[in-house]
Amino acid sequence: MSMSERTNDAQERALVDAAAAVLRRNDLGGRTRAAPRLYPHQWSWDSAFIAIGWATLDPGRAAQELRTLFAAQWASGMLPHIVFDPAVPPGSYFPDAAYWDCQRLTEAAPRTVQTSGLCQPPVHALAVRRIWAVAEGGDAATRAAGQAFVRESYPHLLAWHRYLATARDPEGSGLVTIVHPWESGMDNAPRWDRPLAAVVVGSLPPYTRADLQHVADPAQRPTPAEYDRYLWLVDVLKRARYDDAAVQRAHPFRVKDVFFSAILVAANVALLELAALSDAPEEERVAITGWIARGRQGQEAQWEETLGLGLDRDARTGQALVARTVAGFAPLLAGGVPADRRAALLTTLDSAAFLGHPGLRWRVPPSTSPADPAFQPRSYWRGPTWPVITWLLWWALVQDGEVARAARLRQAALAQVQACGFAEYVEPFTGEPLGSQEQSWTAAVTLDWLVGSGAPRAIGHGRPG
C-alpha cells in the first residue's frame, strides 16, 4: 500500500469515527436529535437518513429510530414531520407542540406523543430496506431481528404510502400535494416563491423565532416575510382541524411537489420488496405496483424540455412553477426514465447550471442553480449545497447504473465533509459551513458513503439499499 493510500485510509477511518460520534452525541436513546441546538426534536425525514447511518453501526439502534417515529403515526397514516421531545425546555424551538395543538384539534393525532400537523418526504422505506440489507449479512440472531423488524414496519409504511397516494393525491395524478413549504423539506426554495406570494397573511400574534438564536448570520435562514407566511399557513390548517379533505379543497397553498413525489416512487419500489419479505397479500402488492406506475407517469407530465428538469405544479392554478433547483432531477430518483429524457437530465446535471459551474468549491449540486435569478449562495435552500441531497442524487445515479458518475459525486461529497465537518449546508463557492453544526443526517450519510451502501465494495456487489 502506498503512502497516499495509507493516508486516505487513515482520513476515512477518522471521518467514520467523527461521524459516529455525532450520532452518539445526538442520541436520546430511542430517537436522535436532528442537531444539538437548532433542531432538538425528532424530524421525520431526518430520522430516515439517520437510521441509514445507524445501520452501519448498530442495526438494532437503527430500527429503534424508526420504531419511535412509527409510534407517532397518525390514524390517517401520516407520519408527522416533528415528534416533540417533552424533555426539551419551553422556548427552545418554535413553533412548539402547544402551537400546533394537534391533540385537541383532531382525533387523528396520536394520544401518547406530541407532534406537528405536517409531513415530510417518505424516505423511510429506503431506510427499512437498508436496515434489512445490513441485518441479512449478519449472524442468525441479527437476521431474525431484521426480518422481524421488516414485518413490524411494513404495515406502518403501507399506511403511510396509502395516505400519500389517496389523501394527498385525490386526483390520482401520481403527484403528492404538499400544503406547506415545510413539507417539501426544502423550506424556502424558489420553487415556492410564486404560490407563497399569493398567500394573503391575516393577523398573527407576536412570536419569537428560536432558529435565529443558533446561526451567526440571519441571512442563512428564511426571511421574516417567509416566516409570517409559514405560520399563517399553519393557522389555516388549525382552523381546518387538520382535516385532509377540507384542506385539499380550499387551502391557500397546494403544490404538486415533484421531488417529494419522486421519493415516494423510490420508496414504493423499496416497499414492494418489503412486502415480499413480509408475505403481504397479493392485493397490497398490486396496489404498490400501481402507485409506482402512476408516480412515474406523474413525473413525465411535469417534464420541462427547455430546462431539462422536472417542475412542480401549483395545484390551485394548474401552472408549472419554473425554477432551476436540484428538485428538478426528481425523475432520476423515480426511475423508469426514457433514454432521451435520462440523457437530458444528465446533460443538465453536468452543465454550468449545476455541477459544471466553474465557481463551485466542490462538484456537488447547489440546492438552487447559480443560473437561476433567485440564487442566493448563503440562504438555506436558495443556493447552498446539502450533503443529504447529494446523497439522494448519488443514490439515484447508482440505481440508474451510472456507477462512475456516482463515484465522482461521492468523492466530491466526502472531500466537502472532510473540510467542512458535519454542517447542515455549505456555501457552494467558498466552502463555508453554514446552518447548524453536528447535523445528524450529514453524519449519517457520511457513514453510509464510507462503510455502508456507498463503500466501494458494496457498489461493486450490487445496488445500494
Tell where the protein language model's regions lie, with residue ranges.
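Hydrophobic/aromatic-rich effector regions of fungal transcription factors
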Residues: L105-G137, L392-A396
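Extended glycan-interaction surfaces of carbohydrate-active proteins
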Residues: S2-Q42, L69-R111, G174-V258, Q297-T385, ...
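Internal, well-ordered domain-core segments that constitute the primary functional module
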Residues: Q120-R194
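Core register positions within helices of long alpha-helical scaffolds
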Residues: G53, A127-R130, V134, A267, ...
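TPR repeat positional signature
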Residues: S47, P121, A125-V128, S261, ...
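Alpha-helical support elements that line or immediately flank enzyme active sites
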Residues: S47-G77, A327-V337, T390-V403, R410
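Long, repeat-rich segments with strong aromatic
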Residues: A250-R294, F375, S379-A404
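Extended, well-ordered alpha-helical scaffold segments
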Residues: A10-A19, D58-A71, D139-L164, A267, ...
